[in-house]
Amino acid sequence: MTEPETLALLDMKEPETPEKSPPQALVLQSEEEGGTESPGTESLRVGSSVGSPIVREGPEDGPDSTISEAATLPWGTDPHPSAPLPDPPGWRDIEPEPLESEAPTKSEEPFKEDANLLPEKTVRAFVPIDLQCIERKPQEERILHRDAGPGELRNFLPARLSHPEPPERKWAEAVVRPPGRSCGGCGSCGGREALRAVASVVAALIFFPCLLYGAYAFLPFDAPRLPTMSSRLVYTLRCGVFATFPIVLGLLVYGLSLLCFSALRPFGEPRREVEIHRQYVAQSVQLFILYFFNLAVLSTYLPQDTLKLLPLLTGLFAISRLIYWLTFAVGRSFRGFGYGLTFLPLLAMLVWNLYYMFVVEPERMLTASESRLDYPDHARSVSDYRPRSWG
C-alpha cells in the first residue's frame, strides 16, 4: 500500500476513532526500550497532546514512519497485554456525579427495623449474666468494693426487673386437687364431704347425751356440799383449770411448729403445718370463754344433787377439743364429731339457762338471792346429806 492511500484511509477513519491512543503508547514504549528516539517519535508526542494526526508532521521516509503507519491501521489497534491502560480523553472535563445517599439509607432502615422485631417484654427478659459475679462469694465482693474508689464503681449490668408474682399463683395450692383422687368437676366430691361432716355432727348429737349420762351414773364421785352461790362459782372456776390443758398444749405445739418451719415472720406466707395449730388454738380459746361462762351461770341454777355435772362437762370439753385437734390435723371431715362434742353441750347449757331465767325463776333473773330449789323447801340439812357409797 502506498503512502497516499494510507493517508486517505486515515482521513476517512479519523472521525470514527479519535480516541484510539494505545498504539502510540506502544510505539513509544518500543522506542524507549531500544534506547533511541527518532524525530518521528517527537512528532508523535506533540501530535498526541494536541489531538491532530501524527503521521503528517513526521518525516516521510524511514522505518519509523512505516511502523507508525502500520500501528494506525484498524487491524493493529489492539493494545499489548502488558501495557497500562491509558485514561480516556476528556475525562478531566467530566464533572463527578454526586453519590446517591438514598441507597445506604434504604439499606440501613430495614436493618434498624429488624433490630426491633422482638417485643419490649421479650427484650426485657434477656438479662446479661456475668459468671464471675455468680461465682463470686459475698466476702470477695465486699473486699472489691472496699478497695475500689468512689469513682471506680460502675454498674455494667442493667437493673434487673422484678417480675411480681401473679395473685392467681398464691392460692394455687388450695386449688390443686390431691393426686390420688380424680374428680370430673361434677360436684359430687363436695357433696360427699358435706354429707360426712353432717353425719359426724349427728353422731356427736347421739353420742353426747349417752356419754354424759353414763359418766354421771357410773363414775364413783360426788360433788361437795355447795350451799351458797359464791362457793358454786369458785368450784366451777377450779374445774375450768383442767379445761385449759388442751389449749396450753396447742400453744406449745404451735410455738414449736413456728421454730421448726422457720415461720417467725408475722406477715409472711402462711404454712399449712403452722396454720393448723394456730386455728385450733384460736377456736379453742373462743369456745372456752363461751363454754365456761354458761357453765358458771348453770352452776347457780343446778340443785345440789346435779352439781356433779360441772366436772363432767369440763372433762367433756377437754376430750372433745383433743379429738377435734387430731382430726383437724389429719384433714378429715370427721372432725365435725369433735366439734359437735364441744358445741352441743354449749348449746344445751344456753337453752337451760334461758329456760330457768325466763320460766322457772324470772324473779331471780338479775338478783343474787338463794335459789328456792335448795332453800328452804328443797334443801336438805347437813346432817341428812350423805355421800353415795360406791364399791
UniProtKB/Swiss-Prot annotation:
GO terms for molecular function: identical protein binding. Residues 1-114 are annotated as: Disordered. Residues 1-200, 262-279, 331-339 are cytoplasmic. Disulfide bonds: none annotated. Coiled coil: none annotated. The keyword Transmembrane applies. Residues 222-240, 301-309, 361-391 are extracellular. Residues 103-114 have a biased composition (Basic and acidic residues). Contributes to the epidermal integrity and skin barrier function. Plays a role in the lamellar granule (LG) secretory system and in the stratum corneum (SC) epithelial cell formation. This is Transmembrane protein 79.
